[in-house]
Amino acid sequence: MQRTEKYFEPDAFRTQCESTILAAEPDEKTGGGRIALDGTVFYPEGGGQPADRGTLTLPDGATLNVTDVHEHDGILWHSVDALPESAVPGTAVSGCINWEWRFDKMQQHTGEHILSGILHQMFGAENVGFHIGSEAVRMDTSVPISAEGLQAAELAANRIVWQDVPVLVSYPTREELAALVYRSKKEIEGQVRIVTIPGADVCACCGTHTRTTGQVGQIKILASENYKGGVRLSVVCGQRALLAAQAMRQRQAEIGALLSAKADQTAVAVHRVYDEYTALKFTHFGVCSQLFDALAQLANPGEDAIRTVPGLDPDGLHRLAVRLTEATTGLCAALTPTEKGTGYCIAQADGDVRALTKALNTALNGRGGGKPGSCQGSCAAAPEQVEEFLREQNR
């Protein structure tokens, strides 16, 4: 079978093509099929870039949605959501890509090249991992980079965008390639395609790119984390960067409204609320300790002590249950009502409450467990029902 001509390589802005079906086969898993064409505008998945989406239209008017594209031995196979009988070898077909999908991937890919090139220039960082996700671009570098370094690189990358320099594609000979300094993640057989962004990057790449850096719009690093000796970056470009900025602005506005703070004072307001929360947390801890002591003093040595206190979190439940075991050798339980039933902590000094906890979970639709002396969890019954069950089981 002849190889598929890639119309997107000389012109990434081409959106339509007239082609001929080379082969068609059903896909039993999806209920659709796969179609090989003699030429296509659809970019196949590869090099960290997702495949194009779009449609194939047959002469009889049947329109097939292209959901994925893969290349095998030079042939591009288009996954479609249906395979009518008219889709046979030799049939003419009209292809049309989803341009918004394509241009988004072009913005992300060119933006990644710019940022990767800048990181390489500034820090000697190699791009050791790259993927265009549905929400952000993931980039992995070979060396650690500080927050200040990333901020400087982000600014330098956007300066390349503002310069609106051309994105150049070339196919050097082996002799020319040997003298060329360029980025590449792997050894490439056959003709090497070089994408050059003057002042930023020279890289071997098979993907689709914008014509100029200005079409990238903006490059924004959303997040970074240490990863395998380097950093993993979450990056957005173009329209994604705009949408991310709008979302950040909306979140900031909501936080500002809640805290009665202006946009440039939200961080100060959050710190103030956090300090207040921390102080209240310590106060709450002390008040609970006094309450737990008082409840423990009501317990008679050797008798069961089951106490219900509204509003306790798991830590509070555990603290109360342990405090009760210091006052009695009987069965101890701390309970608190929840939206779905009851949170509990069952404990006993020198005892094993695991079997009792298992029985409670079975009887009252609960879940939880722990160590012999203390088990914690929740169930669907009210605190009164839990207390009644525990007392009945421990008679």
Can you say where each PLM-predicted feature lies in the sequence?
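A glycine- and charged-residue-rich anion-binding loop/surface
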Residues: 1-395
